[in-house]
Amino acid sequence: MDIRYSCNQKDFKRYTTEEMRDEMLITGLYKADEVVAVYSHVDRMVTLGCMPVHETVSIDKGIDVWANFGTHYFLERREIGIFNIGKDSTGIVVADGVKYELGYKDCLYITQGTKEVTFASADPEHPAKFYMVSAPAHCSYETRLIKMADANHRPLGSVETCNKPVSYTH
């Protein structure tokens, strides 16, 4: 797991573009059948990527949870949001024995205290790409799947300004 430290604000003011990229940019999040994780000391956030192709992958694969977080399992005191950003793919997430199918741009929130989380792809020819962000949690909420079709769609901008994005709130 890559660990990123916060930078000194005085030093940051004089960073070059290259230095900013080195400090902030996360690359290489998707490797077949691996979990890639980047821990940031800023807000104690963990950004993760997983692209299961030929096997089912556990959320803590390659992460020493005890050494990095002082917990027995990854979500003991953390919560996580998971998006499938693999186009034309269906991803399967199993959280404590409950199976969730995520289509492209679907989101799954998993609450703290969930012991086992695994990832798989329905079709290895079109693997799911799970983009995840985990944060410390202090209470439990209901684990919930939110399909892209059920997300709040909020059109922004205008055709006249050639800027007409849509904000999707899960």
Model-identified regions with their sequence ranges:
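Basic/polar N-terminal segments that are highly enriched at the extreme N-terminus
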Residues: 1-4
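Intrinsically disordered, low-complexity, positively charged segments
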Residues: 7-66
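Glycine- and acidic-residue-biased ligand/ion/polar-headgroup-sensing regions
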Residues: 43, 50-55, 72-96
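Short hydrophobic-aromatic micro-motifs
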Residues: 46-47, 83, 108-110, 130-133
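Short beta-strand His + acidic residue motifs that chelate non-heme Fe in jelly-roll/DSBH
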Residues: 91-93, 116-123
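Short acidic-glycine-tyrosine-enriched beta hairpin
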Residues: 96-111
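Double-stranded beta-helix
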Residues: 124-164
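Conserved small/polar residues in nucleotide/adenosyl-binding loops
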Residues: 169-170
